[in-house]
């Protein structure tokens, strides 16, 4: 526990261990993907129903199922990230095959009563994918990662470093001779340090590879009252797994007299968690061609375990030194995500054109890490950095037998109070519905901007990132 607190306090690497509010945002944010039909229409299903992915949006839609159904959705994803650092543009990408959805719906007719059906469903939906690769490279003649370590180490005695009673990066830097004590003549100035790099320009290179996903097991129940009012509830049990591996290199480019030639610093962070939430929803059929809907999502309460491992290697002209530090005991904490509210409407034109729209609101400042005494800084940062935001989704569907054409758009608002890191989704799809079975395909283009700090923001400006995700989604379903 003490070592982790020291690592957090140092805040040298903002990717893995420095900002607990980053973890809170990651597990509170969801992608706008699901079955092929859901994805093709921008996820605007709050008043439509009859779609398994919508059980994680507005569970009232379960009341619209008139037949039992099985659905299965694989997807193929290509993610690319472009970085812009000190005049150098770099790109990286990864590909992945996912299972986005698997579910069963059972209809239970109630006969000649006002409650026409009571339906139940079980399955799971993928809510977010964490697969991403980032590559950052450029030359820096200013303050470097090593300078950051030197300044953070100043104030610790040599005895502190030798016994490991300092920030873990400082201890590793000492043990690998990345830093040395400052001398005043022949006397050591204890508590003051210098870098063994020269003062010249350094080439900096970093790769960040993350993988994992946020999935939700859903248990839903709902019904239809007089085919006018549809009510539903979903018990969600989300599970998350996240791994991030970051490798940073800093090396001399101009000074050939320096004995220290290169620093390699790597970090590996893993997180596993599970939680629970409740979603309640209603849809009302105003007329044969117009429906409205509303839903509310309680906060998800997560229990999360993390492991962190780091390694530092220094390369000299005639030797290489390696120092690693890991954490064998997992660090466990709790996270509560924000509430979410959704209002929706949909209408039909000319019997074959469907238009739908959703409006979502959630307040990222309401996320909270527990226990309080461990996360005072993180919770203050959540309140300061994040904001209340809105998501807008629009979808359309045209039935031109035997095909169904679809398109959608979603604007997912930025969680950050002072920076526009919103995302836009553009989607298209095609479906075939043969009564007893259906097959849908969708393409989704998702784009958004972000930033990454190579190390402490007092030493360096953020690197600009542009992330693009291409998703090809297939759904097959059977009714019985």
Kindly label every feature range from the protein language model:
Residues 19-33, 38, 107-480:
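Outer-membrane beta-barrel porins/channels
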Residues 36, 48-57, 63-140, 215:
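Outer-membrane beta-barrel translocator/receptor signature
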Residues 13-14, 68, 403:
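Alpha-helical transmembrane segments and their juxtamembrane interfaces
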Residues 1-24, 480:
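Bacterial Sec-dependent N-terminal signal peptides
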Residues 9-17, 60, 74, 430:
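Residue-level signal for alpha-helical transmembrane segments in multi-pass membrane proteins
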């Amino acid at each position: 526990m003490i070592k982790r607190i020291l690592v957090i306090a140092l805040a040298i690497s903002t990717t893995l261990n420095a900002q607990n509010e980053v973890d809170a945002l990651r597990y509170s944010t969801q992608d706008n993907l699901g079955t092929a039909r859901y994805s093709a229409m921008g996820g605007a299903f709050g008043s439509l129903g009859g779609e398994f992915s919508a059980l994680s949006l507005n569970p009232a839609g379960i009341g619209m199922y008139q037949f039992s159904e099985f659905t299965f959705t694989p997807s193929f994803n290509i993610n690319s990230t472009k970085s812009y650092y000190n005049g150098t543009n770099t790109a990286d990408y990864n590909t992945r095959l996912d299972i986005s959805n698997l579910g069963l719906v059972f209809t239970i007719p109630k006969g000649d009563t006002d409650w026409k059906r009571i339906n139940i469903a079980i399955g799971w939906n993928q809510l977010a994918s964490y697969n991403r690769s980032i590559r950052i490279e450029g030359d820096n003649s200013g303050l470097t990662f090593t300078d950051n370590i030197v300044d953070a180490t100043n104030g610790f005695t040599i005895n502190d470093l030798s016994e490991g009673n300092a920030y873990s990066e400082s201890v590793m830097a000492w043990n690998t001779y990345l830093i040395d004590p400052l001398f005043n003549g022949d006397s050591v100035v204890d508590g003051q340090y210098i870098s063994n790099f020269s003062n010249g320009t350094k080439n900096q290179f970093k790769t960040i590879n993350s993988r994992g996903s946020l999935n939700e097991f859903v248990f839903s129940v709902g019904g239809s009252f007089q085919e006018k009012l549809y009510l539903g509830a979903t018990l969600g049990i989300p599970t998350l797994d996240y791994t991030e591996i970051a490798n940073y290199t800093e090396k001399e480019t101009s000074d050939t007299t320096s004995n220290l030639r290169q620093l390699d610093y790597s970090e590996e962070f893993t997180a596993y968690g599970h939680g629970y939430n409740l979603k309640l929803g209603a849809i009302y059929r105003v007329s044969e061609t117009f429906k409205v809907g509303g839903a509310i999502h309680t906060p998800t309460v997560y229990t999360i375990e993390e492991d962190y491992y780091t390694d530092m290697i220094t390369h000299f002209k005639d030797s290489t030194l390696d120092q690693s530090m890991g954490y064998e005991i997992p660090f466990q904490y709790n996270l509560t995500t924000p509430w979410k509210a959704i209002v929706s409407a949909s209408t039909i034109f000319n019997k074959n054109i469907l238009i739908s729209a959703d409006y979502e609101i959630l307040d990222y400042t309401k996320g909270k890490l527990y226990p309080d005494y461990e996360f005072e800084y993180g919770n203050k940062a959540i309140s300061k950095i994040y904001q209340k935001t809105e998501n807008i989704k629009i979808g359309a569907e045209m039935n031109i037998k035997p095909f169904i054409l679809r398109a959608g758009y979603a604007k997912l608002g930025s969680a950050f109070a002072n920076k526009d890191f919103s995302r836009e989704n553009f989607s298209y799809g095609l479906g075939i519905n043969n009564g007893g079975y259906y097959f849908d395909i969708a393409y989704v283009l998702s784009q958004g901007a972000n930033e990454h700090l190579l190390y402490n923001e007092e030493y360096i400006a953020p690197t600009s990132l542009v992330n693009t995700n291409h998703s090809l989604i297939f759904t097959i379903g059977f009714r019985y």
